[in-house]
Amino acid sequence: VLAAEHGPRGVRVNALLPGGTDTPAATFKTPESRTFVENLHALKRVAQPEEIARSALYLASDASSFTTGTALFADGGVSINRT
């Protein structure tokens, strides 16, 4: 809705959906809990903050000048993983 409303004025509206990311807020109590979260991702690891930042920079850059009304999944495949 926001993309449709603001698009005519050249405003792009997108969402960034990150997967598990290795940050201080993502505390893993045990190695097993980290492994569990990693295994939720198709890539079998969590992201580094820089990887999510690059996705955000893409959305904010001219490289995405024709991208609006979309969600960018930077989730390591957690949204498609079936294990």
Language-model segments: residues:
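Alpha-helical segment proximal to the catalytic Tyr-Lys
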Residues: A4-E5, S65
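Short C-terminal tail/terminal secondary-structure segment
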Residues: L57, T68-T83
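A conserved structural motif in NAD(P)-dependent oxidoreductases
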Residues: H41-I52, A63
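Active-site loop of short-chain dehydrogenase/reductase
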Residues: P8-V11, T70
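Conserved active-site helix of classical SDR/Rossmann-fold NAD(P)-dependent CH-OH oxidoreductases
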Residues: A4, V11, A53-R54
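A glycine/serine/threonine-rich, flexible loop-to-helix segment
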Residues: P8, P18-L40, E51, N81-T83
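Conserved SDR Rossmann-fold cofactor-binding beta-strand/turn motif
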Residues: R12-D22, A60-A63, F73-D75
